């Protein structure tokens, strides 16, 4: 789009906006938006799930983005990354072209994360930084989407303080993006579309996948666990499983397209299938069916220990393309804290599960998540988390200071753990994480492993980088032709969180190493 076209478009858009009447949001949250309510959320399982396989771009929207560009900034989990791929697919279907220059983008979307306060602060900082851009280019559309958009306090804050935002839409509204954009172009007021109905699963949404080697595949949406610290069941809604035939067809398509690795996604993948009324079919069954598809690696995340079944262990133990890496968040090693967290398992039942996994899958790599400084956590309770870590010997862990989320039950709890104590505990835990990570890495010295090469190293573009089946980062010198392929690499040096090696040969079949 040249400068004259841009100016003409700006005048037309602003004229249209001036003719519109400003919206009255006074009843918005009363009629459409439901703020977090544990009591109300627990009733939602009674709703039916509708499967919509007829998604298409309406004729009236075709060409909407012709001559226009878009940029999406993504915060948060793999689910958000996948949502970004879908939004990019819809935008390209509308005729928009992707750009990496935010100053040139005609549509800017901020895909947000609500899991921790720090993530929200980054988003508000980002939106604030865009005020200058909006002043200079009022025709550009700025949208805030993702999990933060499902929070009443966030929407109110944007409505009050960030008039540079043109549209707010939630996690259940992505398929409505063409309508949202159309209204934003014509509306003088901010477009707010945080759809509270969460019972639909929309298939056949277009996607622009990040790369051609690894792919995300959603198998379910939402979460019904209601851990007391977590906002996700409210922002992502109730558990809804995709039909297995739709998932399997998507995976087959990715295999045909040459993808080497897929990750099955869900807020709690272990609950997969429980809501499908006409079928007795769980994650173990899905994994077994996908193991028959010619794709080298299959991962899944995130797992809740409560739903991890012996059937799943049995399928993973068979080997094949289901990788021997299980991410199993424990959050705490103390029963009292686990109960307050609403995790539905005990230290003993978690360790029993770990022992069953290790017995059936001796070469398994276990990783976890841990929260430090939960409301009223004592030193003795924290010590139990450390001792559990010693007992399991996780190969890696994602560790966090507790972050209060408005609307969750934990937000009402009195927090008497001083900040300096929390940080000191986190430091002690991270020291242990580093110790066991280094111990796991040392096993690889002198061994040959199969690496899925993803591209150049972030630190040195003359070095290639990729991951083993157990998700270990490997940096190595090798031919550029290795990118996107499985290669054998001999490990020369082990570090605390990565491995260095030498390229040996191409390997189209996974090499199983213990």
Curated annotation (Swiss-Prot):
Record note on cofactor: Binds 2 [4Fe-4S] clusters. One cluster is coordinated with 3 cysteines and an exchangeable S-adenosyl-L-methionine.
Enzyme kind, highest EC tier: transferase
Domain Radical SAM core: 209-439
GO cellular component terms listed in the entry, alphabetical order: cytosol
SMART domains: Elp3 (SM00729)
Amino-acid positions noted as binding [4Fe-4S] cluster 1 in the UniProt annotation, renumbered to this chain: 77, 113, 147
EC id: 2.8.4.3
Annotated signal peptide: none
GO molecular function: 4 iron, 4 sulfur cluster binding; metal ion binding; N6-isopentenyladenosine methylthiotransferase activity
Domain MTTase N-terminal: 68-186
Quaternary structure, from the entry: Monomer.
Function: Catalyzes the methylthiolation of N6-(dimethylallyl)adenosine (i(6)A), leading to the formation of 2-methylthio-N6-(dimethylallyl)adenosine (ms(2)i(6)A) at position 37 in tRNAs that read codons beginning with uridine.
Protein name as catalogued: tRNA-2-methylthio-N(6)-dimethylallyladenosine synthase
Annotated gene: miaB
